[in-house]
Design a protein with these regions (language model features):
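Flexible assembly/topogenesis modules
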Residues: 1-319
Length: 319
């Protein structure tokens, strides 16, 4: 199926886990992020100022992009978890070293969500501007690959590895629902840049906002390609001045998708012949934690919320 993400709708990806070995252990979702060139919006009037977009991905990008993970066998759902749940689980249960490793794997690093303060910079965003060099403009945020661990019961402990060898007539399926792209990054509101420039504070710029893809100035194609050079590369744009960047057809290439190459990676384990026979002939029982997530809206001030629980409850989390 498609390996790209939708701009305005949830994206669903279904993975059938093949029986390449006897046990399934660590499982990851791999997502490739594109290079990001965050351009600058030139002044349209004499009293206006230059307005940078200052594109950045949201914090905890790898887990926040996951809306839901559903694990099932033979049509029966075994576990459902969300990216928010995994984030809370990491914050609560992981030690500092494991937490730092998890953040690097899932893109929760300054190079992705705070480029103005990464690579030795201090509040200096690396805005992309068209260049006459052979290599072109340097990306504001370099593309990289995220490896997002699926924190299901079988991936947290090797003793709980999923027994694929016991699946004689059924298959293990993992279904991932990812949030739309417009919920995964923020930009400056370049249309609300002030004109009150003072030496002590510089030019006032707009607040960070979620992009509105109904606005031509917020289209994703403006960030996944270098800014066109109207001087040295006339084939890249129909215009001759950077001030025309506000025009809807300033960018000739207006494709919003990129090669996200979304796929699953898993760690398998092999058993001896005696162990395979034991798994295949004897019933295997596992204690699986079911995750229930409830959203409470309009909680203002001191209020009581109703917690509906049943059976044995190991813990609650609020966030």
């Amino acid at each position: 199926g498609s390996r790209s993400m939708r701009m305005l709708e949830d994206s669903e990806f279904k993975f059938k886990i093949p029986r390449y070995a006897d046990l399934l252990m660590d499982t990851y979702i791999c997502v490739t992020l594109p290079h990001i060139w965050s351009p600058i919006y030139p002044p349209q009037e004499r009293e206006h100022v230059w307005a940078p977009y200052e594109f950045k991905w949201v914090e905890n990008l790898g887990v926040e992009m996951i809306k839901e993970i559903e694990i099932s066998v033979g049509g029966q759902i075994l576990q459902k978890i969300s990216g928010s749940y995994m984030k809370c689980l990491v914050e609560r249960d992981f030690n500092t070293d494991k937490k730092n490793l998890f953040n690097k794997m899932t893109g929760n690093i300054p190079e992705i969500n705070d480029p103005a303060n990464s690579g030795g910079r201090v509040n200096m965003y690396p805005t992309a501007y068209f260049s006459e060099s052979q290599n072109g403009a340097e990306p504001s945020i370099k593309g990289q690959r995220l490896y997002i661990p699926i924190l299901a019961w079988f991936s947290m402990n090797s003793k709980m590895a999923f027994p694929l060898v016991s699946l004689q007539y059924n298959e293990l399926h993992v279904e991932i629902t990812l949030r739309p792209v417009n919920e995964l990054f923020v930009i400056r509101d370049i249309e609300k840049v002030g004109t009150d420039i003072r030496p002590t504070r510089g030019a006032p710029i707009g607040n960070y906002i979620q992009p509105n893809f109904n606005n031509q100035l917020h289209q994703f194609y403006r960030f996944i390609q270098p800014p066109p050079n109207p001087t040295t590369d006339p084939n890249s744009t129909l215009y001759t001045s950077l001030r025309d960047i506000i025009q809807p057809d300033y960018y000739i290439q207006q494709r919003n998708n990129w090669a996200a190459d979304i796929h699953a990676i898993a760690t398998y384990a092999f058993l001896s012949d005696e162990e395979v026979k034991a798994f295949a002939l004897q019933p295997q029982n596992y204690l699986i934690k079911e995750v229930y997530q409830t959203e409470y809206k309009n909680v203002v001030g001191t209020q009581k919320v109703k917690l509906e629980t049943g059976g044995m409850v190991s813990n609650w989390m609020w966030y």
